[in-house]
């Protein structure tokens, strides 16, 4: 098997495929809409953190779903009696540059674009005076992308309206979406051509309300995000969400034992997240004295998942692309990474200059700062005041890494190399056909760079 021919497609749940087996972690210094977009365009998926208000998290879900949409079904519209001020407000809210104009029955009347608004000076100018209503470029259902691209090129336009046989607006197509499809052929998309996105929620009534609202916003994957997934509250949360919606897929975690995996699968989880204490910023194993070494945990949990066809996700402990390959070889269907993506352009936060080098802040969701901001219930400390919190993580900084795409390229390149070395053509082969060899401390030392001083840093190998 040549690395270039290795097939990296996998499933995060039975019904959600990924083109690369990577998720970005639901951490407030890793994943917001910008990271989720980058992950989905690369073929993976981003999980939006929940240290956001419900409205902000919903807005970020919508932002990802609208970023690259194929045909935008039910686009934001204006009526002819609305004003320039209304159009500007919607433009700011939804980050779009044009609006179809429809009557009260949904029939298409025209379109208002950025160019139309630029030449209207008064905020009270009605939409009917600004819109282009004649000689509209319209595509009738069923829409064909090749025909749409040809029409856009011929008319020198960037937006195309899709209507049914009664001239009712059914969708909107933009040249940006067509171009993005060409630039990102491996993007992870839903059946409507929109980027896929996940979001973290929690347990209890507040968690259920958040989950319902995220489902309404169009989220593809809900992650019940707790530090201890083998608890009654997590199982009840999974059951409650699955009873409320057959559409949404639910990931539950975190766990580290076969028994815990079995309990969450019995509760209805579509995937189980594995990892207690392996993360670079996590102190659970030291503070609580609880945890299982990550490779052992993945192996034990994956054996249970394999019996029911439920995937497990390796969450934490991945420092190099080789660790990622080992997680897959141990039985994980995909891996969740945090510190690898912390410090990239798409991660939230500003670049900090420290001792001549650039860094970005990075913290665990069990750190004092993150818990005080809203993630305390992840560690079942919701009622504790700030000074009474018992943290299970730290706050720090990681080197600035540039675009997330560069990191993902190196990660997938390392995985492909591992698949080539082991003769595994697919991720399923990798999960089931690899053998592990015990290694001593001397063997580990030998595995790393030794007896030489590094003069030029490699993009996929950093020590310290």
Language-model-derived ranges and their functions:
Residues 4, 54-62, 120-124, 144, ...:
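Active-site-adjacent beta->alpha loops and helix N-cap segments on the catalytic face
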Residues 35-36, 209-217, 256-274, 314, ...:
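Catalytic cores of alpha/beta
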Residues 49-51, 77-78, 98-100, 138-139, ...:
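Catalytic beta/alpha-barrel core
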Residues 19-24, 70-75, 190-200, 240-256, ...:
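Short beta-strand/loop segments at the ligand-binding rim of alpha/beta enzyme cores
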Residues 41-56, 219-231, 270-288, 318-352:
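Glycine-rich phosphate-binding active-site loops on the catalytic face of alpha/beta enzymes
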Residues 50-64, 101, 105-121, 152, ...:
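Terminal amphipathic helices with adjacent charged low-complexity linkers/tails
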Residues 1, 78-79, 140, 150, ...:
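Alpha/beta catalytic cores of nucleotide-metabolism and tRNA/nucleoside-modifying enzymes
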Residues 2-18, 25-27, 56-96, 101-103, ...:
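Bateman/CBS regulatory modules and CBS-like beta-alpha motifs in cytosolic regions of diverse proteins
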């Amino acid at each position: 098997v040549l690395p270039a021919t290795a097939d990296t497609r996998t499933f995060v749940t039975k019904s959600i495929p990924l083109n690369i087996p990577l998720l970005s972690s639901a951490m407030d210094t890793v994943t917001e809409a910008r990271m989720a977009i980058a992950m989905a365009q690369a073929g993976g998926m981003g999980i939006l953190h929940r240290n956001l208000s419900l409205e902000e998290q919903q807005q970020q879900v919508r932002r990802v779903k609208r970023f690259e949409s194929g045909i935008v079904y039910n686009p934001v519209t204006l009526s002819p009696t609305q004003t320039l001020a209304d159009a500007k407000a919607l433009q700011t809210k939804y980050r779009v540059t044009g609006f179809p104009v429809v009557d009260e029955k949904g029939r298409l009347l025209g379109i208002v674009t950025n160019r139309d608004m630029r030449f209207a000076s008064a905020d009270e100018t009605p939409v009917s005076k600004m819109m282009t209503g004649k000689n509209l470029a319209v595509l009738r259902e069923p829409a064909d992308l090749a025909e749409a691209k040809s029409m856009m090129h011929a008319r020198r336009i960037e937006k195309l309206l899709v209507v049914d046989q009664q001239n009712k607006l059914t969708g909107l197509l933009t040249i940006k979406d067509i171009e993005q499809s060409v630039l990102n052929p491996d993007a992870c998309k839903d059946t409507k051509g929109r980027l896929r996105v996940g979001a973290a929620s929690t347990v209890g009534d507040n968690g259920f309300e958040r989950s319902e609202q995220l489902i309404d916003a169009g989220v593809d994957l809900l992650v019940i995000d707790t530090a201890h997934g083998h608890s009654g509250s997590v199982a009840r949360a999974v059951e409650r969400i699955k009873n409320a919606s057959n559409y949404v897929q639910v990931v539950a975690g975190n766990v580290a034992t076969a028994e815990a995996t079995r309990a969450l699968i019995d509760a209805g989880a579509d995937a189980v997240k594995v990892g207690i204490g392996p993360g670079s910023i996590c102190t659970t194993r030291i503070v609580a004295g609880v945890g299982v070494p990550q490779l052992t945990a993945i192996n034990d949990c994956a054996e249970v998942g394999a019996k029911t066809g439920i995937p497990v996700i390796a969450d934490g402990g991945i420092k190099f692309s080789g660790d990622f390959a080992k997680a897959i070889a141990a039985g994980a269907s995909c891996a969740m990474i945090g510190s690898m993506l912390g410090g990239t352009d798409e991660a939230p936060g500003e670049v900090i200059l420290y001792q001549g080098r650039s860094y970005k802040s990075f913290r665990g969701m069990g750190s004092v700062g993150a818990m005080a901001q809203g993630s305390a219930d992840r560690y079942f400390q919701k009622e504790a005041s700030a000074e009474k919190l018992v943290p299970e993580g730290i706050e720090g900084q990681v080197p600035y890494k540039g675009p997330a795409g560069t990191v993902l390229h190196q990660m997938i390149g390392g995985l492909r190399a591992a698949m080539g070395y082991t003769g595994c053509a697919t991720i399923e082969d990798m999960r089931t056909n690899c053998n592990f060899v015990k290694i001593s401390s001397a063997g580990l030392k030998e595995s790393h760079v030794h007896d030489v001083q590094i003069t030029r840093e490699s993009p996929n190998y950093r020590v310290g």
